[in-house]
């Protein structure tokens, strides 16, 4: 049935055949509610067709989560229909009426937990073995049919009148094994069920764990950790060691049986079939063990109910003159004597029990509480008013007939004393059908169960909400995994279509590339000629500007130097005027001669530089044409391998795309899982904090009640002290009178007056002392009682705080463990995916390498012939340059004149047409380093190392040093830069054209002859546009 079907919809034939069409209200009579649970209510009923007593479990599927409730009903009905075994509850049918399912099952006396509730003591080892053996046989039947119960506990192990043990409450069962849902009752859950969503699936061995916990429950009256919050118990079970039997009086067989069931690792835990052969179950025991236990329990229940009934009867009809305290005390003594006679325990349970929260009524029936308390009286009165005693255990029913026998006369009928004959007739009718309503539960137990169900609705709703959240998280993860899988399949289909479409476009692309190449070749040729002219004009303009700047600079320097010389002559007054003029004339001639020589040198260097740059430019153009030829050949060769190259590149790209999608899917899945775990942890923490708050509030309410009750207690103690002092005063008064009479009798009458006065003073003094003692006793009692109450309440509060803090720390440790496990799982999944992707990538690269090697031989031969031809052309050009006077170094390196020459850099938009169009080209085999790229580099010109000779006549400096320095600098680039702190950079010099593809060592080599795999491994392919 689809999970999204409307609740109660019977249009699906498979669902409709699960339910009978009859009206259940017409088939079953005498319905009486005998239990209540989170699923609904359990009723006793009688089938009017055959007078058979049955149990009816009513489950509503309206309101909140109606679809989920409906699915749970369908699942339970399907499960019960499959059961055919003596140790499982018998299913009789299911009916629908007004959004409520009536699940009819066989009637049982009660559950194993009822035995503990009635007797208030653990079962004997022989009885535990018998009950466990029967339950294990039922579990073995389920497990052999790939079914899991998932809620095994004493409250779900039922007993019948013939002494059979049956499994009940299959609302949590799973038809398929393994399973991965978070279901069950917390205290009995196996660790793998608690960690179901985090670690994966589990099988029927979870029932073996629950059976081990149930064995401890039968041996110790409650399961381990039962005094702990249910949520805290989950965290404790998940991360701590397995529980063991506390007492040492149990046999070694029993202890070994429990230890075997509670193996923490599921693989180490035996199966149900293996456990059936355990020595603990195979030991000899009487066949009537369970029968005797049931009979003993029924007798105890009957007598306890009689005592409770007589107690209520006397309370209602006691005479006014008789004090109620006396009657109550007598009844309590009578009950106590009976319990001692039957071997039961009458002490009240001091520990507060927390009912386990399952979807069945047995979850509440397994809580450990006292037999009779004051809160049960009102419930029992109401039940007796209805004329019945009702009990329940899980989906089976345990009943009490209407109280019409000799001990259940209706206390609310005043005329009952006068109607003995009618009562006797009812008692005889009841006794005839007594066996149909036998039970092993007391009325007070049923009442308390209903009260606990109402009081603990918050806890039950919290746990059910937590289970519902865990199931929703699992469904969400499964839906996400299915969605990602379908998305990956669609992605693969889309890639296949893309590859086919790309292959069909290869022929059209080849034709377009050929036409585009021809247009580029023509454009390169025209552009090269235009740029050569612009290049020459640019150099000439820069040289002219440099010459003008030099002439203007010489004029300025000449004037400055002339003024300096005149000042020097004026300072030297001792020199004759004629000598001064001759010396001045010589300085002027020397300066003019130096400037003329400097101008001639500049013109010579400019001419050399211009010729060299033009020759270099032509060589660059030749290299650019060679590169273009290489592009032509490359295009021609690529016509044969373009399809293969692009196909391989596309395969690699598709591989990368698929890899990226897989990693993204894994990241999304892990992020979703982490987010769900974070939400789960927040919910767990919120539940724990809410539980802590509720416990503290309950303690505060208890303390407030104690504080309110304290004045009454203090008043009673004060009255007690007052009575003690009154008695003391009376004694002293009697003693005073006796002493007075004695003295008056033994002394003369004349001394009587003085004696009376002395006795009166003595009496007054003693009474004053007694009054002081009374006041002191009262004050001491008040202060002691107040201090004792404060200390007691503070101790209780601190004890509660410590307990709650431990539970919170347990939760934090559990959540940390889950987070560490999740992170490790995510890391493991990531490594596995990386390994799969790496293997797939290696296989793809191997195939591409084999395909590319087949084309490489032909390609290498064509390239070799082209490179030989281009090398011959370069050699011829270089030979012509040598004939014209240009060295090979001058054409391929930085010219010597460039170190003394400064030109302005061309504008930013200056094109460099000789630059090859492609980024990678073949080398010619001719070494060609080329000039460095200097046009676009801002440079600085170092200041001249020689001054203009501003020294007076007779100094060691002379102007002749300047031209020699300049000359040496122009003749050797290395000498010009060797004596300076750093390499002399050029300022305003035109940048030589950058080298072509064959221009230097950095570009040497064959781009297509390099490893094809190294280029394709990065997911790239060559661009031929």
Curated annotation (Swiss-Prot):
Region (Disordered): 349-377, 899-930, 945-1025
Membrane-spanning intervals of the chain: none
Biased composition range(s): Pro residues: 905-914
Composition bias type Polar residues, residue spans: 1007-1025
Co-factor requirement: Mg(2+)
InterPro entries: Kinase-like_dom_sf (IPR011009), Prot_kinase_dom (IPR000719), Protein_kinase_ATP_BS (IPR017441), Ser/Thr_kinase_AS (IPR008271), TAO_STE20_kinase (IPR051234)
SMART domains (UniProt xref): S_TKc (SM00220)
Catalytic activity: L-seryl-[protein] + ATP = O-phospho-L-seryl-[protein] + ADP + H(+); L-threonyl-[protein] + ATP = O-phospho-L-threonyl-[protein] + ADP + H(+)
Active site (UniProt): 151 (proton acceptor)
Extent of the signal sequence: none
GO cellular-component term (any): cytoplasm
Task performed by this protein: Serine/threonine-protein kinase involved in different processes such as apoptotic morphological changes, MAPK8/JNK and MAPK14/p38 MAPK signaling pathway. Activates the JNK MAP kinase pathway.
Protein name, UniProt field: Serine/threonine-protein kinase TAO2
């Amino acid at each position: 049935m689809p999970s999204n079907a409307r609740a109660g919809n019977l249009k699906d034939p498979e669902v409709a055949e699960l339910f009978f069409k009859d009206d259940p209200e017409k088939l079953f009579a005498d319905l009486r509610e005998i239990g209540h649970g989170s699923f609904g209510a359990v009723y006793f009923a009688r089938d009017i067709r055959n007078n058979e007593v049955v149990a009816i479990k009513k489950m509503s599927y309206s309101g909140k989560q109606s679809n989920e409730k409906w699915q749970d009903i369908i699942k339970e009905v399907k499960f019960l229909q499959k059961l055919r075994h003596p140790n499982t509850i018998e299913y009789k049918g299911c009916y629908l009426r007004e959004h409520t399912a009536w699940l009819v099952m066989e009637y049982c006396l009660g559950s194993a937990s009822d035995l503990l509730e009635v007797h208030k003591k653990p079962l004997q080892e022989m009885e535990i073995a018998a009950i466990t053996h029967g339950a294990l046989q039922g579990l073995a039947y389920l497990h052999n049919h790939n079914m899991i119960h998932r809620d095994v506990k004493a409250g779900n192990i039922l007993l019948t009148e013939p002494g059979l043990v049956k499994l009940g409450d299959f609302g949590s069962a799973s038809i398929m094994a393994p399973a991965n849902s978070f279901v069950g009752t917390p205290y009995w859950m196996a660790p793998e069920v608690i960690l179901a969503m985090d670690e994966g699936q589990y099988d029927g061995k979870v029932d073996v764990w629950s059976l081990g916990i149930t064995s401890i429950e039968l041996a110790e009256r409650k399961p381990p950790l039962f005094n702990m919050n249910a949520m805290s118990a989950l965290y404790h079970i998940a991360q701590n060691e397995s529980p063991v039997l506390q007492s040492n009086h149990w046999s070694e067989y029993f202890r070994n049986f429990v230890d075997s069931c509670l193996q923490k690792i599921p693989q180490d835990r035996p199966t149900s079939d293996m456990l059936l052969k355990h020595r603990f179950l195979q030991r000899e025991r009487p066949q009537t063990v369970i029968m005797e236990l049931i009979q003993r329990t029924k007798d105890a229940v009957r007598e306890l109910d009689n005592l409770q009934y007589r107690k209520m009867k006397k309370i209602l009809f006691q005479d006014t003159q008789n004090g109620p305290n006396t009657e109550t005390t007598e009844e309590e003594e009578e009950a106590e004597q009976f319990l001692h006679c039957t071997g039961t325990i009458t002490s009240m349970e001091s520990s507060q029990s927390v009912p386990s929260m399952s979807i069945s009524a047995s979850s509440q029936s397994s809580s450990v509480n006292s037999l009779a308390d004051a809160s049960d009286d009102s419930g029992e009165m109401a039940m007796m008013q209805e004329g019945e005693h009702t009990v329940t255990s899980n989906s089976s029913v345990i009943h009490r007939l209407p109280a019409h026998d000799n001990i259940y006369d209706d206390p609310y009928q005043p005329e009952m004393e006068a109607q003995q004959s009618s009562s006797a007739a009812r008692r005889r009718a009841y006794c005839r059908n007594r066996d149909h309503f036998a039970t092993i539960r007391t009325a007070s137990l049923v009442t308390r169960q209903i009260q606990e169900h109402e009081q603990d609705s918050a806890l039950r709703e919290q746990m059910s909400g937590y289970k519902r959240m865990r199931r929703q998280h699992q469904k969400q993860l499964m839906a996400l995994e299915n969605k990602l899988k379908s998305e990956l399949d669609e992605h693969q289909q889309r890639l296949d279509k893309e590859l086919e479409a790309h292959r069909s476009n290869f022929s059209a692309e080849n034709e377009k590339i050929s036409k585009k190449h021809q247009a580029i070749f023509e454009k390169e040729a025209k552009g090269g000629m235009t740029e050569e002219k612009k290049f020459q004009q640019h150099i000439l303009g820069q040289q002219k500007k440099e010459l003008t700047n030099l002439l203007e600079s010489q004029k300025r320097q000449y004037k400055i130097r002339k003024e300096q010389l005149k000042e020097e002559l004026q300072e030297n007054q001792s020199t004759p005027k004629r000598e001064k003029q001759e010396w001045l004339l010589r300085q002027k001639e020397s300066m003019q001669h130096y400037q003329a020589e400097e101008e001639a040198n500049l013109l010579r260097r400019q001419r050399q530089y211009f010729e060299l740059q033009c020759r270099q430019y032509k060589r660059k153009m030749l290299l650019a044409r060679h590169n273009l030829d290489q592009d032509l050949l490359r295009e021609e060769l690529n016509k044969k391998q373009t399809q293969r190259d692009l196909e391989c590149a596309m395969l690699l790209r598709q591989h990368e795309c698929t890899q990226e999608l897989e990693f993204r899917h894994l990241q999304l899945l892990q992020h979703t899982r982490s987010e769900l775990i974070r939400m789960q942890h927040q919910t767990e923490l919120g539940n724990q904090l809410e539980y802590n708050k509720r416990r503290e509030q309950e303690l505060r309410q208890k303390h407030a009640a104690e504080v309110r009750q304290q004045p009454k207690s203090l008043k009673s103690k004060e009255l007690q002290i007052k009575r003690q002092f009154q008695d003391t005063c009376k004694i002293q008064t009697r003693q005073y009178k006796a002493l007075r009479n004695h003295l008056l009798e033994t002394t003369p009458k004349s001394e009587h007056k003085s004696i009376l006065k002395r006795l009166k003073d003595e009496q007054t003094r003693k009474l004053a002392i007694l009054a002081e003692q009374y006041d002191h006793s009262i004050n001491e009692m008040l202060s002691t009682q107040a201090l004792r109450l404060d200390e007691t309440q503070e101790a209780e509060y601190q004890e509660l705080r410590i307990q709650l803090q431990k539970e919170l720390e347990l939760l934090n440790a559990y959540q940390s463990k889950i987070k560490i496990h999740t992170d490790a799982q995510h890391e493991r999944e990531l490594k596995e995916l990386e390994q799969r992707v790496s293997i797939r990538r290696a296989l793809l690269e191997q195939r591409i390498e084999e395909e590319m090697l087949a084309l490489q031989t032909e390609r290498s031969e064509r390239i070799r012939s082209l490179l030989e031809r281009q090398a011959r052309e370069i050699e011829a050009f270089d030979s012509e340059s040598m004939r014209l006077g240009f060295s090979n170094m001058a054409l391929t390196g930085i010219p010597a004149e460039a170190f003394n020459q400064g030109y302005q850099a061309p504008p930013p938009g200056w094109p460099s047409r000789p630059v090859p169009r492609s980024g990678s080209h073949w080398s010619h085999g001719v070494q060609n380093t080329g000039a460095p790229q200097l046009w676009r580099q801002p440079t600085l010109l170092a200041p001249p190392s020689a001054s203009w000779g501003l020294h007076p006549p007779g100094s060691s400096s002379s102007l002749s040093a300047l031209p020699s320095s300049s000359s040496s600098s122009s003749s050797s680039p290395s000498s010009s830069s060797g004596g300076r702190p750093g390499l002399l950079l050029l300022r305003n010099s035109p940048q030589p054209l950058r080298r072509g593809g064959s221009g230097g060592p950095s570009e040497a080599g064959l781009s297509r002859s390099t490893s094809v795999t190294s280029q394709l491994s990065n997911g790239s392919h060559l661009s031929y546009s």
